[in-house]
């Protein structure tokens, strides 16, 4: 999973902007665009993003790493 792209997808699905996310985590808007380009993120940063977007990125990453056997 490209976590940066996934963050961007979730943000867009929620109808929110990069500027909004920047104000919430907080950082500069240009940094948010850099986040979108990253394949991995620092755990603390991903935690802040998860909280403000109310989305469990950690669960999705875990499910990708350890898929359930059917």
Task: Give the label of every model feature segment.
Residues 44-60:
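DNA major-groove recognition helix of helix-turn-helix/homeodomain DNA-binding modules
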Residues 26-41:
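Recognition helix of helix-turn-helix/homeodomain-like DNA-binding domains
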Residues 12, 23, 51:
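Alpha-helical residues within the helix-turn-helix
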Residues 1-20:
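A short, Lys/Arg-rich alpha-helix, primarily the initiator
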Residues 9, 14-15, 34, 59-70:
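Short, charged recognition helix plus adjacent turn
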């Amino acid at each position: 999973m490209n976590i940066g792209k996934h963050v961007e997808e979730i943000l867009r699905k929620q109808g929110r902007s990069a500027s909004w996310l920047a104000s919430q985590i907080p950082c500069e808007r240009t940094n948010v665009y850099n986040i979108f380009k990253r394949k991995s993120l620092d755990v603390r940063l991903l935690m802040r993003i998860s909280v403000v977007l109310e989305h469990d990125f950690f669960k999705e990453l875990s499910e990708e790493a350890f898929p359930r056997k059917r």
